[in-house]
């Protein structure tokens, strides 16, 4: 598995993930990029789960974003509909965390689309550790979204054996209206 964490704070949304890929109890790769930019760099996304499955989902989600003119929530719902009804997709074992200027969402393997409380997402085997640390940092510090993601990934990596200390982090600056 892995750890993906997303935080939205002070006109920034950030998604970060570790770089470890395991096969059974063996580390196969330590610098995988599980977070990427999509749709003309307006959407950031991270995955937890099977690597091949996740790349398939990235491609499918990017196609949905294009079809839905970059509307994140609409694309996520359309993706979830396909995930629920397509036999091949139902066999894919992965979760996606996606965000743009307006929303942060989790797309599950069951075809659910979840907008979490406080725009905090943490998925994967290290997700509970990252979520707890990010929540504590959000509530008790003035750290930036990026700093919270970095520290949460470090904490998760110190606890979860399926999470390492080689993160990929992507950030979007949210344009304020006015």
Swiss-Prot record:
Q: Which family does it belong to?
A: Belongs to the peptidase T1B family. HslV subfamily.
Keywords assigned by UniProt? Allosteric enzyme, Cytoplasm, Hydrolase, Metal-binding, Protease, Sodium, Threonine protease
Catalyzed reactions: ATP-dependent cleavage of peptide bonds with broad specificity
Activity regulation statement: Allosterically activated by HslU binding.
Q: InterPro entries in the record, alphabetically?
A: ATP-dep_Prtase_HsIV_su, Ntn_hydrolases_N, Proteasome_sua/b, Proteasome_suB-type
Gene Ontology biological process: proteolysis involved in protein catabolic process
Q: Which organism is it from?
A: Hamiltonella defensa subsp. Acyrthosiphon pisum (strain 5AT)
PANTHER family according to UniProt: ATP-DEPENDENT PROTEASE SUBUNIT HSLV (PTHR32194:SF0), METALLOPROTEASE TLDD (PTHR32194)
- Principal localization? cytoplasm
**Tell me, how does this one assemble?**
A double ring-shaped homohexamer of HslV is capped on each side by a ring-shaped HslU homohexamer. The assembly of the HslU/HslV complex is dependent on binding of ATP.
The protein's location, in the record's own words, is: Cytoplasm
Coiled-coil positions are: none
Q: What is annotated as the active site? A: 2
What Enzyme Commission number(s) apply to this enzyme?
3.4.25.2
Q: Which residues bind Na(+)?
A: 157, 160, 163
Cysteine disulfide partners in this protein: none
State the Gene Ontology terms under molecular function: metal ion binding; threonine-type endopeptidase activity
Q: What is this protein called?
A: ATP-dependent protease subunit HslV
Q: What would be one Pfam family of this protein?
A: Proteasome
